[in-house]
């Protein structure tokens, strides 16, 4: 039986953690033995990631932290190239145990979902972890990355494992401020939305005068009325737009509409569930079978 290890090196509030966990669950449901290996960001604990998953989903399973030794023929899957480049860029912050796990997972067969977070660093990261080109397979959402490489692949949310959303409105407008860049852009607009909540981490750049919702947030999708979309930089797969569509919530598109990325693409795409869209990940399943 093929074993797939999905590697996540992001923060607990990052969308790639959620896509990674959702695909882990779906592949297991299809009979493919899959684990999610989380190599923690130094600012966060196991419990931070556990809470992030438990707040969103009906189950917590097949998740391993930091210490894992794959079999020689296992397949590693990353849901975005940044999961590899972050491991390279943050390498000196990891424990020896984490470094060993990363080298073990990033030394063999790799299925890599194309992204452009760290274009220059990606080939350097591949070399750092001693990947051989013939063992690296690319998948890509070509609507988002028109010049990307790889067979077509679209990241789709697995709504089938979501906890029921309880309607309990606490703020009218939700903003995303989970890093310094996002937060700076939110600050440009927030004065026009007095009844707001900013999804954020407790970090030194936040404005204490604002109303914050610190990650993880219980029943996040049930506590706001409207999402205000302000991300100023490239956004490949904005989950919350799809989540709002799924729930029938309003979204205010408050960013430069000339930005060509996943924002306008996911704005137009209908909300759908991964379990109903197996054809959309056919290339992933095909490569798992072939490698």
How should these model regions be labeled?
Residues 1-94, 118-124, 252-291:
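N-terminal pre-catalytic "stem/leader" segment of glycosyltransferase-like enzymes
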Residues 4, 33-35, 108-111, 194-198, ...:
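Hydrophobic anchor at the start of a short beta-strand
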Residues 18-22, 178-192, 201:
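A conserved mid-protein helix/loop that constitutes part of the nucleotide-sugar donor-binding site
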Residues 39-42, 174-180, 197-209:
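Glycosyltransferase donor-sugar binding loop
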Residues 76-188, 278:
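Catalytic core of nucleotide-activated saccharide and alditol-phosphate transferases
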Residues 225, 248:
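A short alpha->beta transition loop at the rim of the catalytic pocket in nucleotide-sugar-dependent
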Residues 229-241, 246, 256, 260-261:
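Nucleotide-sugar-dependent
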């Amino acid at each position: 039986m093929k074993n797939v290890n999905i590697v996540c090196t992001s923060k607990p509030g990052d969308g790639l953690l959620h896509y990674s966990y959702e695909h882990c669950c779906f592949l297991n449901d299809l009979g493919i033995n899959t684990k999610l290996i989380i190599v923690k960001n130094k600012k966060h604990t196991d419990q931070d990631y556990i809470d992030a998953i438990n707040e969103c989903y009906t189950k917590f399973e097949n998740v391993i932290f930091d210490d894992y030794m794959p079999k020689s023929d296992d397949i590693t899957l990353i849901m975005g190239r940044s999961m590899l480049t972050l491991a390279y860029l943050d390498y000196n912050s990891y424990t020896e145990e984490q470094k060993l796990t990363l080298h073990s997972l990033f030394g063999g067969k790799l299925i890599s979902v194309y992204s452009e977070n760290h274009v220059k660093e990606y080939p350097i990261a591949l070399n750092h972890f001693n990947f051989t080109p013939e063992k690296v397979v690319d998948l890509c959402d070509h609507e988002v990355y028109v010049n990307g490489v790889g067979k077509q692949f679209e990241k789709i949310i697995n709504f089938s494992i979501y906890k029921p959303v309880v309607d309990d409105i606490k703020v009218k407008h939700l903003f995303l401020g989970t890093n310094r860049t996002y937060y700076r852009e939110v600050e440009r607009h927030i004065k026009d939305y007095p009844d707001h909540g900013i999804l954020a981490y407790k970090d030194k750049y936040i404005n204490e005068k604002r109303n914050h919702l610190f990650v993880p947030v219980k029943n996040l999708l049930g506590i706001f009325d409207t999402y205000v979309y302000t991300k100023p930089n490239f956004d490949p797969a904005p989950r919350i737009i799809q989540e709002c569509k799924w729930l029938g919530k309003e979204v205010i598109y408050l960013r430069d509409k000339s930005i060509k990325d996943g924002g306008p693409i996911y704005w137009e795409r209908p909300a759908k569930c991964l379990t109903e869209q197996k054809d959309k990940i056919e290339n992933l399943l095909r490569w798992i079978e072939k490698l």
